[in-house]
């Protein structure tokens, strides 16, 4: 039996991926992923991270965001990261592998955070996409709602939240909820984010607690 041919869409995605200048740049600089550059651009405009901060990273693998934040918060800072996928260790990152939707995993994550509050919650979580927006968008919205729930449990007053959201049904309501909880809310589309993608990043600062 011959090898199954790739679909036209998957072949196009692979072609785009390897030609992407940010993918090439990440490879050249030995970075975990192109997501590093998305967060770098957000940091240049919104200044979320400072030395000594404690940060929660949801959907952390392969580690692009954690890798970036380590460079910003330094040795006195702390990152608690979680993903359903494996992630190679990063110095300064306390990584928990497990499904964030599972109550036991959530409890373990909260235990690692401890009694203190965190300065930033960030989420780059995304579901496995089927290609059907009617299925994919609700799955994605469920994940970002969980990320916001995490903020309500662990984020310090005046803390910050950055979350990847896919535009579609439920986006406007979600944005309204975030606006009610934070003093300043921006919607960013970093240059490293592909133009065809529905993804945007909500950057919220000044958590009202």
Curated annotation (Swiss-Prot):
Keyword Nuclease among UniProt keywords: no
The reaction(s) this protein catalyses: uridine(2552) in 23S rRNA + S-adenosyl-L-methionine = 2'-O-methyluridine(2552) in 23S rRNA + S-adenosyl-L-homocysteine + H(+)
Subcellular location: Cytoplasm
Residues at which S-adenosyl-L-methionine binds: 63, 65, 83, 99, 124
Enzyme Commission number: 2.1.1.166
Domain of life: Bacteria
Ranges where the TRAM domain occurs: 191-209
UniProt keyword terms in alphabetical order: Cytoplasm, Methyltransferase, rRNA processing, S-adenosyl-L-methionine, Transferase
Keyword Nucleotide-binding (UniProt): no
Cellular component, GO annotation: cytoplasm
Enzyme class: transferase
GO MF entries: rRNA (uridine-2'-O-)-methyltransferase activity
Signal sequence bounds: none
Coiled-coil region list: none
Main function: Specifically methylates the uridine in position 2552 of 23S rRNA at the 2'-O position of the ribose in the fully assembled 50S ribosomal subunit.
Family note: Belongs to the class I-like SAM-binding methyltransferase superfamily. RNA methyltransferase RlmE family.
UniProt name for this protein: Ribosomal RNA large subunit methyltransferase E
